[in-house]
Amino acid sequence: VNLALAYGAKAIQYFPLIQPIHFAYEEGGTYDFENRNGLIGADGNLTRWYYYAKRANEQVKAVDEYLMKSENDGIIVHGAAATKAIITNGESGEEIISSGEYKQLKKVTGDDCIVGCFNYKGGTALYVVNYNRKEKANVSLSFGCDDYRYTVIQRGKSCDVVGGRIPLTLDYGEGALVVLK
């Protein structure tokens, strides 16, 4: 979900909502209602996927007012694994901002991440996503001035920050929106 938002997606879908009974069937005549497809298992109980979707939806709801009014200008790819997967092995196109800079953003440091770069009502919004699917990431965004004002939205919560550098700690696959004021 977060990578889709970084690339500028305006909608997401979860499929299927309810797990069809035939997807729960395992060899030997048993059923797995917990770890298969669907936010709700064929037995009617919530699966682990429900809780991932719930967490993602809280973040989507919090960033919606910004991203829906923004235009994606591209992404910055930072780190060896992300660069290898997206630029070296992938089919990178004009969406890649190869300079690593975008408007006031001068430098990205730390662990592997993708930074979605947005024009938000003529200003700057950045959606930073941890590229690692297994470990937390520490990422810093450095700007050209020490007294910028930002709104940072992470885990569905918003806070205002002032400074020239923003350190972010992101869970695996997690995203945070940084909006310059």
Where does each model-flagged region fall?
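Conserved, mostly hydrophobic/aromatic
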Residues: 4, 53, 126
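Flexible loop/turn segments at secondary-structure boundaries
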Residues: 20-23, 134-136, 160
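C-terminal beta-strand-rich structural cap/linker in extracellular carbohydrate-active enzymes
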Residues: 162-181
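Catalytic-core region of carbohydrate-active enzymes that cleave or remodel glycosidic bonds
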Residues: 1-21
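Carbohydrate-binding surface patches
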Residues: 81-146, 173
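Aromatic-rich peripheral "rim/lid" segments of glycoside hydrolase catalytic domains that contact
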Residues: 20-81
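Conserved active-site loop/cleft motifs that coordinate metal ions or position small ligands
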Residues: 12-16, 127-129, 151-153, 178-179
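Solvent-exposed beta-hairpin/edge-strand motifs
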Residues: 142-157
